């Protein structure tokens, strides 16, 4: 699944390689103000990396037609505004079409991009086009997903979300607060590499905690779609009867699971997740107001990873230094046991991500697009 694809079709569902998920996760309270996001490190100051060479910056999205992608683009524009020598910003949206994604990369190179940031929704299928852009002298930085290519050969750097840290924090939370019970991980398309990697990490992290028991050594297939997640939940209830924790990597999946338990007249289990959305968080806040909330923890901040990608690209192109790592961690956006409520904005789109560094005014502009 790519972070926040629009219609969640299989061809579009390439999850970060994420993710989303995301070297040190901080467990501090998140301020409600974007410019004070206390739980999330901002990273290095790009102004030390701007250099002096005039720069044409480009972003290529494999699938850009949703609020998450628009938010990430706004995060990049905000970061780029700190370097006055970034003279132009080019953007291309392949709308879920692999052939167009490849041609977009070629086109952005032809238009004079010096730095090309790429969200590789199609994974290694776009690697030949990415390599060609690198060989043409463009500084190429794929972000979110970890590709199989090599820096200096296929691209200049790959800035990606640290999935290992996410699994570790989930398990720490479950051990600290749930303590014992049955678990299942609900994820995407059958056989996809991201979900398999997360599942392997979960099993490894859970090994020291026998009281936390995975009911299956395979993830539950949902195709990253709400309706499929609800159907899968009905099957889980029929097979296992009881579940204490469900683990998710996409907000719409969590919504389907919640609906599945509610339709069955059952208590919603605890949820440890990443990549929630405004709808899920508003549903949880409404349940809390009624005294019906379930234990909930989610890791966020994925829209800001593009800022790290831009900084790395700028440092390479300008010959300056970027001290930040290539693996970027998410942070705790909500923790019902830690007293951290998620942000809910009824005026924002259902699929909005409110966990980044944009001000409310900047987010409002994004939502009006």
Which ranges hold each PLM region?
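Hinge/cleft segment of the Venus flytrap/periplasmic-binding protein
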Residues: 35-55, 194, 205, 301, ...
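Short beta-strand elements in bilobed, periplasmic/extracellular small-molecule ligand-binding domains
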Residues: 82-94, 184-185, 206-226, 268
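Hydrophobic alpha-helical segments within soluble ligand-binding/sensing domains
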Residues: 41-44, 101, 157-183, 197, ...
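Hydrophobic alpha-helical
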Residues: 118-135, 202, 222-283
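Periplasmic-binding protein-like
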Residues: 59, 108, 112-121, 139-143, ...
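Flexible loop/hinge segments that line or gate small-molecule binding clefts
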Residues: 128-165, 280-283
């Amino acid at each position: 699944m790519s972070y926040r694809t629009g219609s969640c079709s299989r061809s579009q569902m390439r999850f970060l390689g994420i993710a989303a998920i995301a070297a040190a996760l901080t467990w501090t309270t998140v301020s409600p103000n974007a410019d004070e996001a206390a739980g999330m490190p901002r990273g290095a100051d790009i102004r030390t990396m701007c250099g002096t060479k005039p720069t044409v910056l480009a972003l290529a999205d494999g699938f850009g037609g949703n609020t998450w992608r628009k938010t990430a683009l706004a995060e990049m524009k905000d970061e780029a505004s700190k370097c006055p020598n970034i003279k132009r910003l080019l953007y291309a949206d392949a709308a879920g079409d692999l052939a167009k994604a490849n041609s977009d990369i070629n086109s952005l190179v032809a238009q004079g991009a010096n730095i090309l940031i790429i969200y590789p929704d199609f994974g290694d299928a776009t690697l030949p086009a990415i390599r060609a852009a690198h060989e043409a002298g463009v500084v190429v930085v794929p972000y979110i997903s970890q590709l199989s290519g090599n820096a200096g050969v296929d691209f200049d750097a790959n800035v990606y979300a640290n999935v290992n840290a996410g699994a570790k924090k989930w398990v720490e939370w479950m051990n600290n607060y749930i303590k014992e019970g049955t678990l299942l991980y609900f994820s995407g398309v059958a056989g996809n590499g991201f979900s398999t990697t997360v599942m392997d990490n979960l099993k490894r992290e859970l090994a020291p905690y026998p009281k936390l028991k995975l009911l299956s050594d395979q993830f539950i297939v949902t195709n990253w779609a709400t309706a499929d997640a609800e159907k899968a939940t009905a099957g889980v209830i029929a097979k296992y009867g009881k579940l204490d924790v469900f683990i998710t990597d996409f907000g719409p999946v969590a919504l389907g699971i919640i609906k599945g338990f509610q339709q069955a007249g059952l208590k919603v289990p605890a949820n440890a997740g990443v990549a929630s959305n405004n709808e899920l968080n508003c549903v949880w806040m409404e349940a809390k107001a009624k005294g019906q909330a379930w234990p909930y923890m989610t890791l966020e901040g994925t829209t800001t990873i593009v800022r790290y990608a831009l900084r790395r690209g700028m440092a390479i192109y300008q010959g300056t230094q970027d001290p930040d790592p290539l693996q970027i961690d998410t942070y705790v956006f909500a923790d019902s046991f830690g007293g951290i409520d998620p942000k809910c904005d009824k005026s924002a789109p259902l699929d909005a991500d409110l966990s980044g560094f944009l001000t409310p005014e900047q987010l409002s502009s994004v939502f009006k697009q």
